Amino acid sequence: MGKKGKKEKKGRGAEKTAAKMEKKVSKRSRKEEEDLEALIAHFQTLDAKKTQVTETPCPPPSPRLNASLSAHPEKDELILFGGEYFNGQKTFMYNELYIYSIRKDTWTKVDIPGPPPRRCAHQAVVVPQGGGQLWVFGGEFASPDGEQFYHYKDLWVLHLATKTWEQIRSTGGPSGRSGHRMVAWKRQLILFGGFHESARDYIYYSDVYTFSLDTFQWSKLSPSGAGPTPRSGCLMAVTPQGSIAIYGGYSKQRVKKDVDKGTQHSDMFLLKPAEGGEGKWAWTRINPSGVKPTARSGFSVAVAPNHQILVFGGVCDEEEEESLEGSFFSDLYIYDAAKSRWFAAQLKGPKSEKKKRRRGKAEDPEGTTEQETGGSSAPEPLEVIKEVVSEDGTVVTIKQVLTPSGLGVQPSPKADDSASEASSTGQEPCPRSNAMLAVKHGLLYVYGGMFEAGDRQVTLSDLYCLDLHKMEEWKTLVEMDPKSQEWLEESDSEEDSSSDEESEDGEDKDQEDSAEEGADPQHPEVARGEQFEEYLSRTEQHWLKLARSHVGPEAKEKKVLKVAQAMAKSCFDDAVQDIAQARH
């Protein structure tokens, strides 16, 4: 009895500490949230201009991570919502809704009036009732400089049959958070964990909430037993036995002033309905057999039709006093919930007959050249210099290098064939974290995510597919060359250093401008089907930087903005014209 009493007392003490920390974080973050609420309201004003549902065929979505990818419960479609992208200087937040048709291999952008505000690191769960519903809770909005965060505590449902968003207003729900996990269990949503962060403080959660899909009411659970410590980004999935599995995740704690230590968890728990009445649950810690994933965070999770739980990718951070380096993964682990066993997925590779056939088709006779086989050599990039006049009459000169793709040059039939073959020769996703996963008809889809190359963050927009029945090879559905991604931080530092050196040497402004023009004349390309507003939003920092270099450091921001928009519009119009000419 004495021991039990001590444990209960200790548990209540931990709850009080967590409550104090939450109050402290909430108070300090309120000012930040007020600032961000104004920015969120601005974006919502733009969204309010949408008065009807529009469905527009489009290219694959732009690079992003921490979005949600969900399989439609009735149609052969995947639903992509939200996410974020960082280009080295600015963080972009999204609330776009895309539909990927599995049968047609096409993307459609769906604009619906009254959508949820822009967010990432939310949770989305699909349920079959009413022709299919996508339930979205929480997530975060980051300021453009990535220094401030607003954590949502709102609940939304997308009615897939009617394509309408609805905000569900119900009291007693979880506090604002991101990185939490949520699953559908019978006719309930069950939510666990997550974190809330301000500029100076943070708190991780281990609480559990349920939301009834019948009464639309939140309830906070108080499971018996020792459960997981507070964490975010964990595995959460329903097992065949009706329990809820929790594995891994990430948390951090302050070890001294301005020094935090992160923990990559590798423990596993089951949350089970307990005997003794409805609404009673119990935690049980388990130790499955087999080979579980190595220590990591940022992994992605999906559930296969046979209740096998899939874990893909992630990153293992190695922390030192003032540095953080990560090793990224592209491996796939499977947890067999029926046998309580982990194992690493092994791909068999394509059948030997297919290999031979591909090899015979792809290889050229020894010694042949592209001209001998009927191919055409790639055209040289074309440099174009033009003057642009902004609204206020400012005249600037921009230099643009048009690459073969920018000129609308089509690859030769041979190149098409080889690209088609490459998409099915087992090219696997590169190592990454925070990717989006979904399973439909026994096929695993992996979209986007990110990895780091030195100080640079590369955000991905590729899409891969793996047949979980055959387990032979990955198929590439959308390709991406990470080297083609714009990164502004590196070029800025180089220009700043060169500018400082030139100032010290006493060189004049004209020499400085010409040096900058010659350093990076190539501008961001326009994607097929992209509207100017989308192009400007994606590339705005590039044009602002270029405009500032032309009008000088003393120019007002309004003037710089006008010049930047004029330069972007000129480049956009030229690209659209080139694409149109290439079609004829």
From Swiss-Prot:
Quote the biased-composition stretches of kind Acidic residues, using this chain's numbering: 487-519
**Keyword Protein biosynthesis recorded:** no
Q: Which residues carry this modification: Phosphoserine?
A: 418
Listed A to Z, the keywords are: Kelch repeat, Phosphoprotein, Repeat
Query: Gene3D superfamilies per the record?
Result: Kelch-type beta propeller
* KW Acetylation (keyword) present: no
**Residues in Kelch repeats:** 77-129, 133-187, 188-238, 243-289, 308-361, 443-494
Q: Which InterPro entries match?
A: Kelch-typ_b-propeller (IPR015915), Kelch_domain_protein (IPR052588)
Question: Which stretches are tagged as biased composition: Basic residues?
Answer: 1-10
User: Which segments does the entry list as coiled coil?
Assistant: none
* Source organism superkingdom: Eukaryota
Bias kind Basic and acidic residues: ranges: 11-24, 520-533
Under which name does UniProt file this protein?
A: Kelch domain-containing protein 4
Q: Which organism is it from?
A: Mus musculus
Its taxonomic path starts at:
Eukaryota, Metazoa, Chordata, Craniata, Vertebrata
